[in-house]
Every structure is written in C-alpha cells, then in structure tokens.
Amino acid sequence: MNTLYLGSNSPRRMEILTQLGYRVIQLPAGIDESVKAGETPFAYVQRMAEEKNRTALTLFCETNGTMPDFPLITADTCVVSDGIILGKPRSQAEAIEFLNRLSGKQHTVLTAVCIHYRGKTSSRVQTNRVVFKPLSSEEISAYVQSGEPMDKAGAYAVQGIGGIFIQSIEGSFSGIMGLPVYETVSMLQDLGYRSPLSALKP
C-alpha cells in the first residue's frame, strides 16, 4: 500500500487520502496562523501550507534523525468573502457573524497544498466558488447550536449539515473539504510518487 505523511490533525484530510487507498501517518504541525498586514488571501493560504510543511519536516527530522521516506503533505483552507478571510470561528457569536456574511452570496474557498518528497517541494493553490442560499436567523442559530461550524474555516462543513445551505459549487468538492484530490495526486505524480491506481494493478 502506498504511504503518505500528513502534517495535519484534520479528520477530513485523513479521510480523503484514506479513501484514495493510501496508508496515512499523521504528523501534526502547529504554527502561528495570523494573517500578515497587507497579505492577500491567496498568499496567506499558500504561506500557511508551506510553513506547516517546513515545521512538520523539521519535527520529523529531529525525531527520527533522517528525512521521511514517503511524501509529506500539508494543506490549508480559507474562506474569503468580500476580500475578508473567514477562519475558524472563535465563538458562537463569530460563527453567527460569518454565516450572516455568507448568506445569499457567492464566496471563495482557497485550499493550498504543499508536498515535500525526496528533497523537492511543490505547492499549489486551488480555487473554488460557492453560492449560499439566503439563511434565516433560525437556520443560522440551529446550525451553530449543532456545534459543526466551530472547527471549520468559514463556519460551515460542505460535507456535513452545512451542505444544505449550498446552492452551487464551481470547483472541487474535495478542495472545499480541505484537500483537492486532482491537484494533490497530480503533484505527487509530478514529484515521482506512485498513483493510487498502482496499488490496484494485479
């Protein structure tokens, strides 16, 4: 079975890679996720993925005394509405604020992926556009009370209850979840790593 290191605690990214047939070893890497003054959402999300990768790689080398044998993947996702980055809500009140901002409008979801393998590092940002239906205060309140928004960028989960708010998606469903499958596998292959299909050959 093909093996990957995932520099993340995200159960959603873990699920995506596992469903592709990879054996995944998690190497969580905590970093400062503050936005720099004047930083664009695109630059921010790419910097986050790259910093997570460097941090996870350093921790691996310090712990094991060697470089990883398998690709190390990190990613970061941000929701952008009217040019403003909506991260993970810090309170129920902020989750309500985010959902009111997204209600009845189009927003952008950016997911950056960074992969290190055999001394080479590649990063890419994938862009998605999502349209929310108009949300009532009752819908927002009930959703926030469910607890689902509290650890999600933009205060919603496309693969969960939050999916009922979405009228349309332009882009990648897996990218909105947190790890775009097409881009990730393409990057792995460009770096010389095996396709998930290679494990299925008789």
From Swiss-Prot:
The keyword Hydrolase applies. Its EC number is 3.6.1.9. Pfam families: Maf. It catalyses: dTTP + H2O = dTMP + diphosphate + H(+); UTP + H2O = UMP + diphosphate + H(+). Its cofactor is a divalent metal cation. One of its GO terms (cellular component) is cytoplasm. The record marks R12, T77, Q159 as: Important for substrate specificity. Its main location: cytoplasm. Keywords: Cytoplasm, Hydrolase, Nucleotide metabolism. The active site is at D76. GO terms for biological process: nucleotide metabolic process. It is found in: Cytoplasm. InterPro entries: ITPase-like_fam, Maf-like. One of its GO terms (molecular function) is nucleoside triphosphate diphosphatase activity. Nucleoside triphosphate pyrophosphatase that hydrolyzes dTTP and UTP. May have a dual role in cell division arrest and in preventing the incorporation of modified nucleotides into cellular nucleic acids. This is dTTP/UTP pyrophosphatase.
